[in-house]
């Protein structure tokens, strides 16, 4: 599938050339280049597990939703690959104006640094969803529908979840009442669409609810909500310390749940231009100390550049200490 005429470094350079430009400036890759990114990345996704087992240190990012200049701000702040290892939790496309640049840069980095750069599937990496919420229209306007279908083939092979040093369980959405053993995730065959119910659906769609005990209906009309007791039981059963997920806008870019046993990350500040939220990235160091780097919502007249602040939390104990979370 590799195309000798496509220059990966040139693609990355052009995607990064707009750093410092006024947000909104587009990067128009050729159709052949995008097809190469989709096909080559798809090969790599299939060659790696659907349930990734990763090692710290790494940086974890939540939803991006087509906000390309905010993605560049995240890399400015955390270090452009290969300066740091990254794990993204899905929802790269839809809603924002530059889904194509976002997904092309992420796929290019995946191809360039396959063992250091990881992206999971979100509920928007699914044809029935991104057909409606913007990505299809962006592909059709800037290229053609055939290219959108090429992206769909790639998205259908994305990994679903990742475990960091056996202690941090990450996915886009949340837990599932059907999840008893990690083997169940490993047995999911790719390529696959996202079904309307069941384990894969829940991992991409479910949400925590602090006021709930057990499982409840989800206002989204898909999957479930789950209470703090579900999180505690899950972590105890699997000898883990933390669930890290995305999928919901949170005001500060990150938000704890269930006595810091779960954290929600959202990395698109000023989401859709309608929210005043910050975006956050979580850094996990070798001892599994988690810290947060915050992209503050930009003021209306502010041009490109990150406003950042860092906050550290002893969220998980060192690897060999299994006495529970530090405060």
Curated annotation (Swiss-Prot):
Originating gene: dis2
Signal peptide interval: none
Active-site annotation: 124
Family: Belongs to the PPP phosphatase family. PP-1 subfamily.
Necessary cofactors: Mn(2+)
Keyword Cell division: yes
Source organism of this protein record: Schizosaccharomyces pombe (strain 972 / ATCC 24843) (Fission yeast)
Biased composition (Basic residues): 317-327
Disruption phenotype: Simultaneous knockout of dam1 results in inviability.
One Gene Ontology biological process: chromosome segregation
Protein name in UniProt: Serine/threonine-protein phosphatase PP1-1
Localisation per UniProt entry: Nucleus
Keywords for this protein: Cell cycle, Cell division, Hydrolase, Manganese, Metal-binding, Mitosis, Nucleus, Phosphoprotein, Protein phosphatase
InterPro entries cross-referenced by the UniProt entry: Calcineurin-like_PHP_ApaH (IPR004843), Metallo-depent_PP-like (IPR029052), PP1_catalytic_subunit (IPR050341), Ser/Thr-sp_prot-phosphatase (IPR006186), STPPase_N (IPR031675)
Taxonomic lineage of the native organism: Eukaryota, Fungi, Dikarya, Ascomycota, Taphrinomycotina
Chain segments carrying region Disordered: 305-327
Residues reported in the UniProt entry to bind Mn(2+) 2: 91, 123, 172, 247
Free-text remark on how the cofactor is bound: Binds 2 manganese ions per subunit.
């Amino acid at each position: 599938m590799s195309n000798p005429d496509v220059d990966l470094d040139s693609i990355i350079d052009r995607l990064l050339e707009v750093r410092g430009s006024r947000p909104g400036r587009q990067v128009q890759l050729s159709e052949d280049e995008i097809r190469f990114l989709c096909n080559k990345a798809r090969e790599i996704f299939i060659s790696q597990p659907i349930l990734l087992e990763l090692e710290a240190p790494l940086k974890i990012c939540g939803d991006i939703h087509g906000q390309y200049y905010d993605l560049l701000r995240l890399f400015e702040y955390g270090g452009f690959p290969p300066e740091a290892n990254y794990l993204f939790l899905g929802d790269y496309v839809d809603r924002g104006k530059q889904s194509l640049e976002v997904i092309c840069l992420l796929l290019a980095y995946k191809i360039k640094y396959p063992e250091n750069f990881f992206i999971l599937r979100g509920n928007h990496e699914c044809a029935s969803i991104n057909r409606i919420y913007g990505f299809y229209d962006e592909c059709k306007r800037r290229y053609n529908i055939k290219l959108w279908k090429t992206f769909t083939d790639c998205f259908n092979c994305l990994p679903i979840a990742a475990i960091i040093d056996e202690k941090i369980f990450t996915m886009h959405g949340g837990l599932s009442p059907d999840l008893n053993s990690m083997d169940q995730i490993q047995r999911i065959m790719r390529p696959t669409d996202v079904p309307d119910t069941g384990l894969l659906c829940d991992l991409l769609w479910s949400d925590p609810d602090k006021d709930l005990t057990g499982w409840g209906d989800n206002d989204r009309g898909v999957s479930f909500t789950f209470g703090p007791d579900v999180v505690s039981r899950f972590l105890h059963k699997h000898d883990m310390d933390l669930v890290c997920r995305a999928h919901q806008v949170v005001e500060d870019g990150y938000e704890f749940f269930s006595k810091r046993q779960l954290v929600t990350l959202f990395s698109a500040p000023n989401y859709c231009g309608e929210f005043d939220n910050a975006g956050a990235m979580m850094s996990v160091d070798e001892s599994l100390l988690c810290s947060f780097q915050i992209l503050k919502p930009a003021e209306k007249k502010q041009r490109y550049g990150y406003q950042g602040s860092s906050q550290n939390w002893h969220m998980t104990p060192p690897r060999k200490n299994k006495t529970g979370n530090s405060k």
